[in-house]
Swiss-Prot record:
The keyword Endoplasmic reticulum does not apply. This is Catalase-peroxidase. The lineage of its organism: Bacteria, Pseudomonadati, Pseudomonadota, Gammaproteobacteria, Pseudomonadales. The gene is katG. One of its GO terms (biological process) is hydrogen peroxide catabolic process. It comes from Pseudomonas putida (strain ATCC 47054 / DSM 6125 / CFBP 8728 / NCIMB 11950 / KT2440). Keywords: Heme, Hydrogen peroxide, Iron, Metal-binding, Oxidoreductase, Peroxidase. InterPro entries: Catalase_peroxidase (IPR000763), Haem_peroxidase (IPR002016), Haem_peroxidase_sf (IPR010255), Peroxidases_AS (IPR019794), Peroxidases_heam-ligand_BS (IPR019793). There is a cross-link at residues 244-270 (Tryptophyl-tyrosyl-methioninium (Tyr-Met) (with W-90)). Binds 1 heme b (iron(II)-protoporphyrin IX) group per dimer.
Length: 751
């Protein structure tokens, strides 16, 4: 008998067939409980406080020295790690997308799967290992999230570029995000599913991916993003495992014009306009090179699939030395300029001054070289001083010349290099800070003085806030205004619940509910009546010489309504309210930027703008995760908002009470009542009615969002807590706490 057969452990904890295997469509509440204290080595650690004790200039000095400290185990191209570190920072921040605010550099996710093993991130494992001695030296005073971004900034500065600034404040997490939807493809570099196609194919990394099939995709010159290439929302990359576009062209087709369309869509979904996009590409490709020294079959598995002996590194390369001049990363072998470690405008000069012809890299990937052998010998080799090359370009580079919108922008930057430098500095700063939220979160000595529109600026707060007596007076006036509890609660929710924990945007501060585009959103139908009444109260109060912002008043109105509803249910006590919010102007509000915050569905108000293929309860879960809610908070808020009458348009769906406007646990008691039998009332199973089992009388009507709290085992267990005979007090306490949390999600000035 072998030793192995004697082992008492044939399987270990966490293995075997899981619930998700049996029921893949099951609501996944785990996304509400990520990054808990159990995963953190120091749950009480205050990163902002630690960062403020950092010797920032000493850190930058060490980073600058690292740039030219080439290591034998991973030699620096051209003797300078700057381009590698720019790519590292870019690929950390570049996962951000505006559709849901997820991705980005804000928590150091590049360290974890899947990002650490994306095909587009080959060799960035080495970049982070090069940084480890510096991270080790400065410890918890600098997070990986901040260090990755700062290193990219220092890399630019070390090569002669003047950056716009840097702000810290990105705290690390200690496990992979589970809430980010990266696509449904099951193979790396697959791209069919996100474009609604019927088949997924893949090639090895570095050799392109899908080859366009005219019968399925249409002729390349006739493709249109609104039709054949309509990228699934909220995705901002054309293939699984890429940051943006396929550099060889759409699906490996080397068509610069078609590539331009992909670039515009993907960069736009990362909040970049056409000028910013051109500046980022032209600025970023002023430095460094790509790597495709040999065939991709020389490259081993990614970090997550590599053996223990690799110690978290991946993509072991058996071609030649496997490093230096033998490096294989993207499979493309391109060096754009003769000054790859110094800022210049040569990228655009080469792009426009040469005519280009299609060729292939040693790995077989499509790329471009100057026609007629021009430019030969002008570009240095990255590792052999005895070799010289011609400049080369990617298909995505040529898009800047041949796309009819990008071309005049790129040509203007070619002729005005100072304007390119300014545009690149600003676009780079936006790239690496877009997911940081309001300026109250920014830390460090290099924060720019200039306020930028994409930062959703707010006026400075008046240090003299309203007093407790003022708050009591305003509450009385609000409750005497004739507005219902439901109207007040729904309006406060509409204002505060735009917050996204992903990119820290939205929320009640600023009172942008009264401004375009929020005032015109379908979800906010009816709030104009409430806002008009509150503005009248504000005007009367402010005429006395004191000042209250409408932002504060909107939240206070909801707070007063919750207090009244609790009192009417027989519970005493107050709901916490902390003033200090300000009112933004329309000039401080980028309509296009805020448009992505519009709720297309808000289960908390039983609202859907249209019919969607995604089930309503999954849209609710997504909203709850963006609001940073736990499963108990989600549950208690739904139950409370329903009985308060906060539904959109006064809908009766889910209002399982005969005393709306009273903060009772009726929603849970009546949902779990076994004398009621539920049946769908619509063919799509979106609405239901509950009938008395004996009489057949209709008692209640509800949506999928309502019924999931009795159907889903975990949510039902939570609902039972609040439906119990001793659950009333806990229900009110928990609702009040969750309500105040949502109302203050954007109050980083208090944290």
């Amino acid at each position: 008998m072998s030793n192995e057969s004697k082992c008492p452990f044939h399987q270990t904890a966490g293995g075997g067939t899981t619930n998700r295997d049996w029921w893949p469509d099951q609501l996944n509440l785990r996304i509400l409980h990520q990054h808990s204290s159990k995963s953190s080595p120091d749950p009480d650690f205050d990163y902002a406080k630690a960062f403020k004790s950092l010797d920032f200039q000493a850190l930058k000095k060490d980073l600058t020295a690292l740039m030219t400290d080439s290591q034998d185990w991973w030699p620096a191209d051209f003797g300078h790690y700057g381009p590698l570190f720019i790519r590292m920072a870019w690929h950390s921040a570049g996962t951000y997308r505006i559709g849901d605010g997820r991705g980005g550099a804000g928590s150091g996710q590049q360290r974890f799967a899947p990002l650490n093993s994306w095909p587009d991130n080959v060799s960035l494992d080495k970049a982070r290992r090069l940084l480890w001695p510096i991270k080790q030296k400065y410890g918890n005073k600098i997070s990986w999230a901040d260090l990755i971004v700062l290193t990219g900034n220092v890399a630019l500065e070390s090569m002669g570029f003047k950056t716009f600034g840097f702000s810290g404040g990105r705290a690390d997490v200690w496990e992979p995000d589970e809430d980010v939807y990266w696509g449904s493809e099951k193979v790396w570099l697959g791209g069919d599913t996100r474009y609604g196609k019927d088949q997924v194919k893949a090639q090895p990394p570095g050799q392109g991916d899908l080859v366009a099939e005219p019968a399925k995709h249409g002729e390349e010159q006739n493709r249109d993003l609104s039709a054949e290439r309509n990228l699934e929302n909220p995705l901002a990359a054309v293939q699984m495992g890429l940051i943006y576009v396929n550099p060889e062209g759409p699906e490996g087709n080397p068509d610069p014009v078609a590539s331009g369309k992909d670039i515009r869509e993907t960069f736009g979904r990362m909040a970049m306009n056409d000028e910013e996009t051109v500046a980022l590409i032209a600025g970023g490709h002023a430095f460094g090179k790509t790597h495709g020294a040999g065939p991709a079959d020389n490259v081993g598995p990614e970090p997550e699939a590599a053996g223990l002996e690799m110690q978290g590194l991946g993509w072991h390369n058996t071609f030649g030395s496997g490093k230096g001049g033998d490096t294989i990363t993207s499979g493309l072998e391109v060096t754009w300029t003769s000054t790859p470690t110094r800022w210049s405008n040569e990228y655009l000069n080469n792009l426009f001054d040469f005519e280009w012809e299609l060729t292939k890299s040693p790995a077989g990937a499509h790329q471009w070289r100057p026609k007629d052998g021009k430019g030969a010998g002008t570009v240095p080799d990255a590792h052999d001083p005895g070799k010289r090359h011609a400049p080369s370009m990617l298909t995505s580079d040529l898009a800047l010349r041949f796309d009819p919108i990008y071309e005049p922008i790129a040509r203007h930057f070619k002729e005005n290099p100072d304007q390119l430098a300014d545009a690149f500095a600003r676009a780079w700063y936006k790239l690496i800070h877009r997911d940081m939220g309001p300026l109250a979160r920014y830390l460090g000595p290099e924060m720019p003085n200039e306020e930028l529109l994409w930062q959703d600026p707010l006026p400075k707060a008046d240090p003299s806030t309203i007093s407790e007596q003022d708050i009591a007076t305003l509450k009385s006036r609000i409750l005497a205004s004739g507005l219902s509890v439901g109207e007040l609660v729904s309006t406060a929710w509409a204002s505060a619940s735009t917050f996204r924990g992903s990119d820290k945007r939205g929320g009640a501060n600023g009172a942008r509910l009264r401004l375009a585009p929020q005032k015109d959103w379908a979800a906010n139908q009816g709030v104009d009546k409430v806002l008009a009444a509150l503005e009248k109260i504000q005007g009367e109060f402010n005429s006395s010489g004191k000042k209250v912002s409408l932002a504060d008043l909107i939240v206070l109105a909801g707070t007063a309504a919750v207090e009244k509803a609790a009192k009417d249910a027989g519970y005493s006590g107050s709901v916490g309210f902390r003033p200090g919010r300000v009112d933004a102007s329309q000039e401080q509000t980028d309509v296009e930027s805020f448009a992505v915050l519009e709720p297309l569905a808000d289960g908390f108000r039983n609202f859907t703008k249209a019919r969607y293929s995604v089930k309503a309860e999954k849209l609710l879960l997504d909203k709850a995760q963006l609001l940073t809610l736990t499963a108990p908070e989600l549950t208690v808020l739904i139950g409370g908002l329903r009985v308060l009458g906060a539904n959109h348009g006064g809908s009766k769906l889910g209002v399982f009470t005969d005393k709306p406007g009273t903060l009772s646990n009726d929603f849970f008691r009546n949902l779990l009542d076994m004398s009621v039998e539920w049946k769908p009332t619509s063919a799509d199973n979106e609405t239901f009615e509950g009938r008395d089992r004996k009489t057949g009388q209709v008692k209640w009507s509800g949506s999928r969002v309502d019924l999931v709290f009795g159907s889903h085992a975990q949510l039902r267990a939570l609902s039972e807590v609040y439906a119990s005979s001793d659950g009333g007090d806990k229900f009110v306490r928990d609702f009040v706490a969750a309500w105040q949390k949502v109302m203050e999600l954007d109050r980083f000035d208090l944290k």
